[in-house]
Amino acid sequence: MQQQQQQQQHLHQQQFSTPQKQATNFFQQGIEHGPTPVTDFNYTPSHQRPYIQPTSGTVVSSHQDLRQIVETTLGSKGVLNQAVKLPKGENIDEWIAVHCVDFYNQINMLYGSITEFCSPQTCPRMIATNEYEYLWNVHPGKPPVSLPAPKYVDYLMKWCQQQFDDENYFPSKPGVPFPKDFKDNIARPILKRLFRVYAHIYCHHFNEILELNLQTVLNTSFRHVCLFSEEFHILKTNDYGPLLELVTEFKDR
């Protein structure tokens, strides 16, 4: 718990102006034709059985089944709202944990596609708009510091991987329970920080996303995070920053 608190980032916020109005325009490009399948891009099935066709109340019993549900439900138009719902009889913490890893892989892939455009020279600070700068606690016990966006994302991805590898946070053995505070003190900080990468991409690299024809993938992935967070009350309104209006648009679809 102490280590978790020491690693807590601080969001430096100045007076909020009108960055949401620009963000809403992103919604009109890519998502309106229906979602492109978004999956855990580093995931390879370990056996050769047909994918589960999930429906409301599908009963699952393993990490493998959970991952298959996440993947297959995203492949059909209009099912994101259903895809985030907890399958019947499944452990809520395990369901959230699987999605944390999947969202990590999605944003890792998306950011990886624009790294040549995001450098210490082009993005000397990790910001969404000028009103929102995200700081990182490089040295525990000392104030968080401003970093170039690529360095911030590098620290973030390594930190996430450390969380996933920690058996105290993400137990991998059957029957080992998740911490009682898993959703609020472990999952929420992970999703909150990953959300900041979406914010940086939307506010500073959306033109590159358009050039790469990845706008549908980005919008679908982002909407998936928003719907999942809303379903399980993970992120709070102030976590959305300059993308609050865009989040509202996606939720209402």
Locate the predicted segments by residue.
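Charged/polar positions within long, soluble alpha-helices
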Residues: 165, 199-207, 227-237
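Domain-level detector for trafficking modules
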Residues: 182-190, 199, 205-221
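Generic structural signal of hydrophobic/aromatic residues within well-ordered alpha-helices
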Residues: 66, 70, 107-110, 114, ...
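The feature captures two recurrent sequence modes
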Residues: 1-143
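Eukaryote-biased recognition of C-terminal alpha-helical segments
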Residues: 214-253
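Amphipathic alpha-helical interface segments within eukaryotic helical scaffold
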Residues: 108-185, 191-195, 200
